[in-house]
Design a protein with these regions (language model features):
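Short, contiguous alpha-helical
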Residues: 1-13, 48-92, 120, 132-169
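Short low-complexity stretches enriched in small and charged residues
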Residues: 14-19, 27-32, 73-78, 114-116
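Solvent-exposed interaction patches of small proteins and small membrane subunits
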Residues: 16-19, 23-26, 82-85, 102-110, ...
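Short, contiguous, helix-prone interaction/anchoring segments in small proteins
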Residues: 19-54
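Acidic/histidine-rich alpha-helical segments that form the ligand environment
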Residues: 26-32, 38, 95-132
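A generic "functional-site adjacency" signal
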Residues: 22, 29, 55, 70, ...
Length: 169
């Protein structure tokens, strides 16, 4: 197993359906509960563990998940409201060392609860036509609403697997 991609790389069907969206939303719906169960009672030593040499700590991963979901949610909304807007990338490495990443992980879990609730509601209202709306990512090019919803679900699971690997070390 490649620990960088413990659940594999993001796989998006060529033709995404509303049923696919529903499945991804089910994963998102249970995520914060599962994340809290995994990290909620960890001590400082456990929060400082990494899943591989040079990787982020468990604490940084939790804060990164919240930061990324926030950014991806904004991109999703822009794709639904604007005509193919261009969105900037964010420097994940620099965000991961900002002072707010020293906060308790519960701060980011609470943030995720709100963001994910909004994602779930918005996602449940999507139409087939809206799945093809898109935005232009500064580095990754054109991304559709369908792909963004897939990534919202995959990204959380991807980093939960990283956290689990770190805690097993």
């Amino acid at each position: 197993m490649d620990v960088r991609y413990p659940i594999g790389k993001l796989q998006v069907p060529e033709k995404v359906t509303l049923e696919n969206i529903e499945e991804w939303l089910k994963e998102i719906a249970t995520y914060t509960t599962r994340l809290r169960e995994t990290v909620g009672s960890l001590n400082e030593e456990e929060l400082s563990k990494t899943y591989r040499d040079g990787s982020w700590t468990v604490r940084q991963l939790v804060h990164h998940i919240a930061d990324s979901q926030l950014n991806m949610y904004q991109r999703l909304k822009l794709a639904l409201t604007d005509e193919n807007p261009t969105v900037p990338a964010f420097d994940e490495e620099k965000w991961a060392i900002l002072p707010d990443t020293k906060l308790p992980v519960e701060t980011s879990i609470k943030m995720l609860e709100g963001i994910n609730e909004r994602i779930l509601f918005l996602g449940s209202t999507l139409s087939e036509d809206q799945l093809d709306r898109s935005f232009m990512h500064q580095k990754n090019g054109k991304i559709t609403v369908a792909t963004k919803v897939a990534k919202l679900a995959w990204h959380e699971e991807h980093h939960l697997a990283h956290i689990q690997i770190a805690l097993e070390k």
